Amino acid sequence: MQLRSRQTQMLFVRDRDIEIHYQATGQGTPFLFFSETACPGDIWNHFQVPEFSRDYTVITHDYRGTGKSSRPTAQYSCDDFVDDAAALLDHLNAGPAIAVGHSMGGRVAMLMALKYPAKVKKLIVASVGPGAPSAPPIPFKMCKEMAEWGYEKYVQEHTLEVGWTREYIQQHPDKVEHFLNIRLNNLPRLEDYLRHVVARQACDLSARIREIQHPTLVLVGEHDHGSATGASHRVAAEALAKELPNGKFAVVPNEAHNYFMTNPDEAHRIIRNFLVSSS
């Protein structure tokens, strides 16, 4: 079902204990965005909301534990994130939606397609793999660096390591600083960040990827080789695309992990071409 309101921002009461903050902008088929690990939904406001709200109803939301949403003290799971999003679509009387997820959000979007297939029309999963059964609850590399540097410096250094190529950092220091400030100013509490990491690590879809029948675009940056675990996002994304029955693989040239911010025009062009070709 298509939505008609131009923009709505409010809290949706998921149940007695959970409120999910969301924003719906535009008109048309729902375009549901899932952010990366422990990142609130307003990260999409810079480029993706203005671009896609011209043709769609863009729905962004803050995961539980981030932004203006509730911060329950129990451990989170990707199932929780999916159930929150599915309930939000029900609340808005919207769907099926084009589900878009970046990094951890891509895995959440795939889980939504598996758990609520009728609520998903198409999938766009960016810079992510299916997970692994042997993934530790918190990656050793993260534990070591966070212990040495502290929470905020870890997030800053990790974002610098995976987010941009060295050339981009040298050529655009002002843009890098701007994005880092956005990320650091919206950090959740440490305990909520770690709950997100544990949820991501526990989300192993590797045995179920072939069950996803939706048209799916797997997107990744050409130089997206870093991750919190030390593995390569690009290698994981390429392997994922080969497993999907209706998967299509695309690369954003010359970019690392943060191409939605550094080269949104190319990312949007690839996405729009996919949406047309998979109609």
Residue ranges and their predicted role:
Residues 16-68:
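Conserved HGGG/HGGXW glycine-rich cap/lid loop of the alpha/beta-hydrolase fold
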Residues 134-136, 154-208:
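Conserved alpha/beta-hydrolase catalytic His-Asp/Glu region
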Residues 60-100:
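Active-site loop/oxyanion-hole signature of alpha/beta-hydrolase fold enzymes
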Residues 223-231:
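Acidic catalytic loop of the alpha/beta-hydrolase fold
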Residues 101, 105, 109:
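Gly/Ala-rich beta-loop-alpha elbow adjacent to hydrolase catalytic centers
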Residues 212, 218-220:
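Short beta-strand/loop motif that positions the catalytic acidic residue
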Residues 252-264:
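Catalytic histidine-centered segment of alpha/beta-hydrolase-like enzymes
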Residues 110, 114, 121-150:
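Flexible "cap/lid" loop of the alpha/beta hydrolase fold
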